[in-house]
Amino acid sequence: MTDPSRLVTPERRGDDLGDAALRPQNLSEFVGQEKARANLQVFIDAARKRKEALDHVLFVGPPGLGKTTLAQIVARELGVGFRATSGPVIAKAGDLAALLTNLEERDVLFIDEIHRLSPAVEEVLYPAMEDFQLDLIIGEGPAARSVKIELSKFTLVGATTRAGLLTNPLRDRFGIPVRLNFYTIEELESIVSRGARVLGTGITADGANEIARRARGTPRIAGRLLRRVRDFASAADAEAIDRKIADHALGALEVDAAGLDAMDRRYLSTIALNYGGGPVGVETMAAALSEPRDAIEDIIEPYLIQCGYLQRTPRGRLLTPHAFKHLGLAEPSREPGQFGLFGGEEEA
């Protein structure tokens, strides 16, 4: 299984609980996602002026980009209550009914990993989202009867890392779909600098840049790296985090200049050395690395693709010349036109 202790995993870890202090409290403090942020501000202002519930919102994007933070900000900007849960926690229709019937007018209900809701729960959610009603079956057999329960008008905010797993009826009920993208180095520098101020740690511009460059476009990882580099700076009695301290700390933590860790380098090296740079199927890679396919597709590969180290093709995974250069390996000779011919997703 993917090691949850990976410093650069975008998934939540136990030590990320300290991130709460680093999170922005409103849209004006939120760095990055400019278009999404601007549109959200318009929709929130309009709903507030009309004193109506905001349309249902769906946040789509890789882990660690701020979906939960934005959901909390939406509720805070609207001045309403906030309830949070996740798809796997809502095991049956009764669990969802208990959540919905306890919402006040215009409250925000946040469901993380909404793509993991069961079909039975989704069926109950549809009329709740559309008509603000619950249609429940009470009893069993001939004595069973349908009961309608009126709900307060609420806003459902869903978050998913895998939009393709959402059913069309569920996706279509979200009036405000918002896609979140990886952050630029400049945006992450601002996030790191703000985080250092919140933590009471001095940091230079080049120190913030060094951490930002290795944060894989992800604020959650930037905050995690900042906390670990701060430990190295404290141990060295340094007044501030500069590039030298950041480089030393991240090198000791095996996070290289491109933000790759040992798992990333192992993935790339396996394709390069064992399969001649590819193409190689994802199932083969899953077996070679003893990792589940989902972990490879959702956690390992997105950043490698973003950086231009990897292509997904109909024939399998294919390393780019950039990947061989990063690994310090000679690129094998390929058939003319083999690289870059296939831009689609792997089918197998």
Swiss-Prot record:
Major place of residence: cytoplasm
Catalytic activity: ATP + H2O = ADP + phosphate + H(+)
Binding site for DNA: 293, 312, 317
Annotated segments matching region Head domain (RuvB-H): 257-348
InterPro entries listed in its UniProt record: AAA+_ATPase, AAA_lid_4, DNA_helicase_Holl-junc_RuvB, P-loop_NTPase, RuvB-like_N, RuvB_C, WH-like_DNA-bd_sf, WH_DNA-bd_sf
HAMAP family the UniProt entry points to: DNA_HJ_migration_RuvB
Self-association and partners: Homohexamer. Forms an RuvA(8)-RuvB(12)-Holliday junction (HJ) complex. HJ DNA is sandwiched between 2 RuvA tetramers; dsDNA enters through RuvA and exits via RuvB. An RuvB hexamer assembles on each DNA strand where it exits the tetramer. Each RuvB hexamer is contacted by two RuvA subunits (via domain III) on 2 adjacent RuvB subunits; this complex drives branch migration. In the full resolvosome a probable DNA-RuvA(4)-RuvB(12)-RuvC(2) complex forms which resolves the HJ.
Name under which the protein is recorded: Holliday junction branch migration complex subunit RuvB
